[in-house]
């Protein structure tokens, strides 16, 4: 039995009347240390405390571990079939744990949530097995692929905004070449960057979202499928047959490449949210004019790609899950569901948006970002409002597959392997390791 009113304790949570009185255990990794400067963890702890204060008859037992320790401990508990009442489920464990009966099927519960219409459905992908949902995606998401460009430099080149097609980027190269600067800076020295910060989004432009979901589900999709090979072919073309990138893209890291942009030696840079925060902070302190000219854009669309031209890869790696054993006590289950819905709901999303310019599962309208500078506001809109989401490849499947693909990608980007060979090796690793 639930009747809702609002209580404000550090932040607003729905104060639902819960019949349960007793212990409820939650295990998570948002330590006090983790929450220092980490908006997602701070928001999680803040809303969790507000929910706890709103329900004095429930004894909320928190088991809080550092992230690395959490991953080890939760795996140990899962192996012993001794998971806590409520815990954070990592996406890559969903399929196996669902098959083992370790996590509750929350499909109907999630669809009955009072916040369901506000949920960003794209975030549920890692926590699906077939059509079933096993968790409420939690904490905050950050993009892995953003084009950061100097609006003034591109204006001088004849573009009011960053080009929406690679063809126009290639045309702009001629202008920037005459200026003695690179068109776009990129660093793949660590081998993972070409996957996380480029192919994961470019691939979506060719394959669409269902293909990668099928790959996750072992539903028949293959790395050797024509659409994915086309994405590899375009990647090789852009890096080996055009001159739009810095020559040393395969030997320098993203940290090196972003310095080319900061120094003005490149007119744009492609990287992730971690690069954006560094670039913005550095330029804000050192070059206010260049800081104010920061612009954000999605990857340009290839000429032969037919899928969503506005996609960028962003996701939430964990979800709030519930131990099926909790269902033995319906009142306790209602409390666990209420907790899961509140720590991922509008109270959390509003808090992280207004305090950190971040977003979570629940979309929030009319967020007041006025206290943030324009660049921060623009990046919030890029990340959560103005673009569509696709998956971060290496958040799924397993590292053995991506180690093979990443190594071969780097070789391909040196012109020493064909896209077909890369695809065949990736498929072989997939079949052997997943």
Task: Please name every model-derived segment.
Residues 107-119, 205-230, 282-289, 301-311, ...:
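Short, solvent-exposed loop/beta-turn-alpha elements that line the ligand-binding surface or hinge
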Residues 129-140, 145, 170-220:
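Extracytoplasmic/periplasmic solute-binding protein
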Residues 53, 157, 241-242, 284-356:
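Extracytoplasmic/periplasmic substrate-recognition and gating elements
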Residues 173, 217-249:
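Glycine-centered hinge/linker elements that transmit conformational signals in sensory
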Residues 64-73, 166-170, 247-262:
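Short helix-initiation/N-cap motifs at beta->coil->alpha
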Residues 1-99, 115, 421, 425-434:
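Conserved N-terminal structural module of periplasmic/extracytoplasmic solute-binding proteins
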């Amino acid at each position: 039995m639930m009747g809702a009113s609002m209580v404000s304790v550090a932040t607003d949570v729905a104060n639902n009347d819960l019949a349960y009185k007793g212990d409820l255990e939650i295990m998570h990794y948002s330590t006090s240390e983790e929450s220092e400067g980490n908006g997602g963890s701070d928001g999680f702890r803040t809303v969790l405390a507000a929910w706890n204060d709103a329900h004095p008859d429930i004894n909320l037992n928190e088991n809080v571990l550092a992230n690395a320790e959490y991953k080890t401990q939760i795996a140990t508990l899962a192996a012993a079939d001794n998971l806590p009442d409520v815990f954070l489920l990592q996406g890559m464990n969903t399929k196996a744990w669902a098959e083992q009966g370790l996590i509750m099927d929350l499909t109907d519960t999630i669809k009955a949530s009072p916040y369901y219409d506000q949920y960003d459905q794209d975030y549920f992908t890692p926590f699906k097995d077939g059509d079933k949902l096993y968790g409420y995606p939690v904490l905050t998401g950050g993009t892995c692929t953003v084009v950061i460009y100097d609006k003034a430099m591109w204006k001088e080149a004849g573009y009011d905004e960053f080009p929406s097609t690679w063809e126009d980027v290639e045309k702009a190269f001629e202008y920037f070449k005459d200026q003695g600067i690179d068109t776009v800076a990129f660093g793949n020295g660590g081998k993972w960057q070409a996957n996380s910060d480029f192919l994961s989004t470019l691939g979506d432009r060719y394959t669409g979202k269902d293909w990668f979901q099928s790959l996750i589900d072992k539903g028949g999709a293959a790395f050797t499928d024509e659409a994915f090979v086309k994405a590899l072919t375009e990647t090789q073309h852009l890096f080996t047959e055009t001159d739009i990138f810095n020559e040393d893209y395969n030997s320098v890291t993203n940290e090196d490449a972003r310095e080319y942009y900061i120094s003005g030696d490149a007119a744009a840079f492609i990287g992730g949210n971690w690069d954006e925060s560094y670039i913005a902070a550095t330029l804000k302190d050192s070059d206010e004019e260049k800081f104010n000219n920061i612009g954000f854009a999605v990857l340009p669309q290839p000429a032969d790609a037919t899928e969503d031209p506005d996609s960028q890869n962003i996701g939430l790696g964990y979800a709030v899950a519930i131990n099926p054993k909790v269902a033995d006590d319906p009142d306790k289950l209602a409390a666990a569901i209420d907790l899961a819905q509140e720590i991922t709901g509008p109270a959390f999303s509003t808090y992280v948006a207004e305090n950190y310019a971040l977003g979570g599962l629940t979309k929030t309208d009319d967020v007041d970002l006025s206290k943030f500078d324009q660049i921060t506001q623009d990046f919030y809109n890029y990340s959560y409002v103005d673009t569509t989401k696709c998956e971060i490849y290496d958040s799924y499947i397993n590292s053995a597959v991506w180690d093979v693909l990443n190594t071969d990608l780097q070789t391909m980007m040196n012109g020493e392997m064909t896209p077909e060979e890369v695809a065949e090796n990736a498929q072989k690793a997939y079949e052997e390791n997943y």
